[in-house]
């Protein structure tokens, strides 16, 4: 099956819109509204692959991909709090000895600093093996502006590493949140 980078700088590879072309030229991440932060030693500009096509499906590779229009946060707020009102989201909240929560969502009383409830949010995306091949596909696209969807760049998805790291975090962070009687949402 074909394997290739399918979304670069926030736009599917087939998207030839002015917005897509501008994002690629400026290396702009529309999900974070800033320059793409991903690096590769194989290119002199940000490694803007958000998603890869493999095994007939799209796999998100960048956690910022989940930030599109705040949809994840709205869904979690509606699911957990029943509303999107009086919500604040903080990123990279430190927990000494454990690590950081990707995000903490706080529901506060209206027009108040009193916290009613909070949840932690963790984002987990795919990781690749033979990433140099994915970079090769990215470079080909950036040079030509197109891809052949039948082409295979021989990278892989390291599912074992994803779940190994995620499981460790679930244990460590889950113990703390269980003591606090709070929930954690995993976006995978």
What do the predicted segments below correspond to?
Residues 92, 98-107, 118-124:
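Short acidic loop-to-beta-strand element that houses the catalytic metal-binding Asp/Glu
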Residues 1-100:
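Nuclease-adjacent, charged terminal/linker segments that flank catalytic cores
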Residues 127-188:
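Acidic, metal/cofactor-coordinating or nucleic-acid-engaging core segments within structured domains
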Residues 50, 62, 89-91, 103-105, ...:
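Generic structural hydrophobic/aromatic packing signal, biased to beta-strands
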């Amino acid at each position: 099956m074909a394997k290739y980078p399918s979304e670069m700088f926030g736009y599917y590879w087939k998207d030839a819109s002015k917005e897509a072309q501008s994002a690629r030229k400026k290396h702009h991440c529309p999900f974070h509204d800033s320059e793409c932060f991903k690096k590769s030693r194989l290119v002199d500009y940000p490694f803007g692959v958000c998603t890869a096509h493999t095994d007939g499906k799209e796999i998100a590779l960048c956690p910022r991909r989940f930030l599109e229009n705040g949809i994840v946060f709205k869904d979690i707020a509606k699911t957990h709090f029943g509303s999107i009102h009086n919500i604040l989201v903080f990123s990279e909240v430190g927990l000494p000895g454990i690590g950081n929560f990707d995000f903490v969502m706080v529901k506060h009383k209206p027009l108040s600093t009193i916290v009613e409830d909070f949840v932690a949010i963790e984002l987990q995306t795919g990781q690749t093996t033979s990433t140099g091949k994915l970079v090769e596909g990215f470079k080909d696209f950036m040079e030509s502006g197109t891809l052949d969807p039948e082409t295979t760049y021989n990278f892989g998805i390291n599912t074992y590493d994803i779940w190994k790291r995620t499981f460790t975090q679930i244990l460590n962070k889950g113990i703390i949140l269980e003591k606090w009687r709070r929930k954690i949402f995993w976006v995978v």
